[in-house]
């Protein structure tokens, strides 16, 4: 495969960058096996939770292990089109089992290991999983979930690291399986065949099933080649649980280009010191982390570390506050390149290495897609006006854009209208074509006739030295309809008090329009988050609504 990432500026990238999608494509055979022909080419560097033990795998290793895994699955009856629920952490088995499923044409359903029994029950039932692959640490949850459902479609249960009643020992099956898998031995996959199913975060309703097709990895050439700026020699670390979509953002395009992945099998609470130590000493040249990770990293003594080998930093998942970008750049000498996309897409908007970065902006639309900001009548908005981020999808789905929400015609009808996919996210475009994120449509705060985006208020609050993390939502108010309320996690060394509340409120008033300041502030030990690390503003909104509407009616906020 040939890719052209040589653009020196944004306009050149718009002209030159294209993705060719063949009629037939199989990520396992067309990417992994072809890369395996390059002797000794590094694919994966894995380290354990403590950063003590490490293993390195070449593309040839991944090829042979995935062949064994595919043959083991074939022997158990797994075939093209079967849905395979995979709940494994950041372990090597995840990668070669994933590739094995792709070689067979099975449809994977990745799942985070932190799922509850109820979550697992919902996903196995709704997704009609034909097989489950997990490990000893998680199989009891699966057993409990399966007991609660009638699942005649579930034919196989595999344990990756041992045996248990009712479970097949997958490691043993692999030992007996051949490392040879001719392409002709399995059914051919078209680029349009089902590939994987992700479940959305489900912060306001039950998770939707997002279906991607077999060409999806090629779409991530935008993510890896343009936004991550990857070259074949690079080693990239994308901080992500294997069960959510940012893991795909750090795998498919990267391996297609031929870069290596650095994987830290992190467990438990995030360890900022260990992360910085691994980042600066284990060879990663490109780093991508969610905003939550960067917010926690800047609380450490960043000056203690040498960042010279890490040439490129990126962030996505939710907006990153400009203050965090500023602190990071001052301490490391490197700027963070923000990007934007969804479970349903590849990167859509980004700050790319071939253009200037505007802190606080998501960047510009990714070359190769037709992206615009539209109003509710599907007309392009003027500069500075807020609208919905939309992707042109009139003839067929662009490569990398999801096929549909499975079994959800209402959501499909709402998302795809007049030849556009509406992301549901709001933004505005400045005079240079840079997009600034405002929020989900239902995140917008309507106070006394003003429309306030939570992110702009959060960014100002984040500049206060007492604030480690914060979230802003609408709180019902009898006078104004809604008021701005901030939930704040304090930085180490600060104590909650009425005086601190007033200080933060005055701080915000001095730095933005007075009507945007948080009339109410509540301190929390931690913010509610989705499995992917995004702040659950919907949970905070609902809590406020129930508190003010459910007990004694509405009250008036601070005047």
Segments (PLM) and residue ranges:
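Conserved pre-ATP/AMP-binding loop-to-beta segment of ANL
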Residues: 40-42, 159, 164-165, 175-199, ...
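Conserved AMP-binding/adenylate-forming core of the ANL superfamily
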Residues: 42-99, 116-121, 171, 175, ...
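Conserved AMP-binding A3 loop
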Residues: 55-60, 187-188, 195-219
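AMP-binding/adenylate-forming catalytic core of the ANL superfamily
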Residues: 115, 125, 132-134, 280, ...
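AMP-binding/adenylate-forming catalytic domain of the ANL superfamily
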Residues: 160, 510-534, 553-559
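Gly/Ser/Thr-rich phosphate-binding loop
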Residues: 174, 198, 256, 284-289, ...
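Conserved AMP-binding/adenylation subdomain of ANL enzymes
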Residues: 218-235, 242-285, 300
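Conserved ATP/PPi-binding loop(s) of AMP-dependent carboxylate-activating enzymes
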Residues: 368, 379-414, 452
């Amino acid at each position: 495969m040939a890719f052209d990432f040589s653009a020196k500026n944004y306009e050149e990238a718009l002209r030159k960058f294209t993705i060719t999608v063949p009629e037939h494509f199989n990520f396992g055979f067309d990417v992994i096996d072809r890369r395996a022909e390059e002797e000794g080419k590094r694919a994966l560097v894995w380290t354990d939770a403590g950063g003590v033990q490490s293993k390195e795998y070449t593309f040839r290793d991944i090829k042979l292990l995935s062949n064994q895994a595919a043959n083991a699955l074939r022997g158990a009856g797994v075939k093209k089109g079967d849905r395979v629920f995979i709940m494994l952490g950041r372990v090597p088995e995840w990668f070669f089992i994933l590739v094995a499923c792709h070689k067979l044409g099975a449809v994977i359903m990745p799942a985070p290991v932190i799922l509850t029994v109820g979550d697992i029950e919902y996903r196995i039932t709704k997704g009609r999983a034909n097989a489950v692959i997990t490990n000893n640490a998680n199989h009891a949850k699966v057993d409990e979930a399966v007991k609660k459902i009638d699942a005649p479609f579930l034919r196989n249960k595999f344990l990756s690291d041992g045996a248990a009643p009712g479970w097949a020992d997958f490691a043993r099956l692999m030992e007996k399986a051949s490392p040879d898998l001719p392409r002709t031995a399995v059914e051919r996959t078209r680029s349009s065949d089902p590939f994987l199913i992700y479940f959305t975060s489900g912060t306001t309703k039950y998770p939707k099933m997002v279906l991607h097709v077999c060409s999806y990895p090629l779409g991530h050439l935008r993510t890896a080649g343009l936004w991550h700026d990857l070259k074949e020699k690079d080693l990239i670390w994308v901080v992500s649980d294997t069960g959510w979509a940012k893991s795909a953002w750090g795998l498919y395009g990267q391996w297609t280009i031929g870069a290596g992945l650095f994987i830290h099998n992190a467990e438990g609470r995030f360890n900022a010191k260990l992360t910085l130590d691994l980042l600066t000493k284990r060879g990663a040249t490109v780093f991508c982390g969610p905003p939550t990770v960067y917010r926690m990293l800047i609380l450490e003594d960043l000056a203690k570390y040498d960042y010279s080998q890490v040439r490129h930093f990126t962030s996505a998942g939710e907006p990153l506050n400009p203050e965090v970008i500023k602190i990071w750049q001052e301490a490391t000498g490197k700027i963070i390149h923000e990007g934007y996309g969804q479970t349903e897409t590849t990167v859509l908007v980004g700050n790319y290495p071939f253009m200037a970065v505007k802190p606080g902006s998501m960047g510009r639309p990714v070359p190769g897609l037709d992206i615009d900001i539209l109003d509710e009548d599907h007309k392009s908005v003027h500069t500075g006006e807020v609208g919905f981020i939309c992707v042109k999808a009139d003839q067929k789905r662009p490569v990398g854009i999801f096929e549909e929400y499975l079994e959800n015609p209402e959501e499909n009808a709402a998302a795809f209208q007049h030849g556009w996919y509406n992301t549901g996210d709001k933004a505005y475009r400045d005079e240079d074509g840079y997009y600034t994120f405002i929020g989900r449509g239902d995140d917008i705060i309507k106070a006394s006739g003003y429309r306030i985006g939570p992110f702009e208020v959060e960014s100002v609050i984040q500049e206060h030295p007492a604030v480690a993390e914060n979230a802003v939502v609408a709180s019902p108010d009898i006078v104004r309809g809604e008021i701005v309320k901030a939930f704040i996690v304090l930085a180490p060394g600060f104590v909650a008090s009425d005086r601190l509340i007033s200080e933060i409120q005055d701080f915000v008033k001095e730095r933005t329009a007075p009507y945007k300041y948080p009339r109410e502030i509540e301190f929390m030990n931690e913010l509610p988050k989705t499995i992917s690390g995004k702040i659950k503003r919907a949970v905070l909104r609902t809590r406020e609504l129930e508190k003010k509407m459910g007990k004694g009616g509405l009250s008036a906020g601070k005047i």
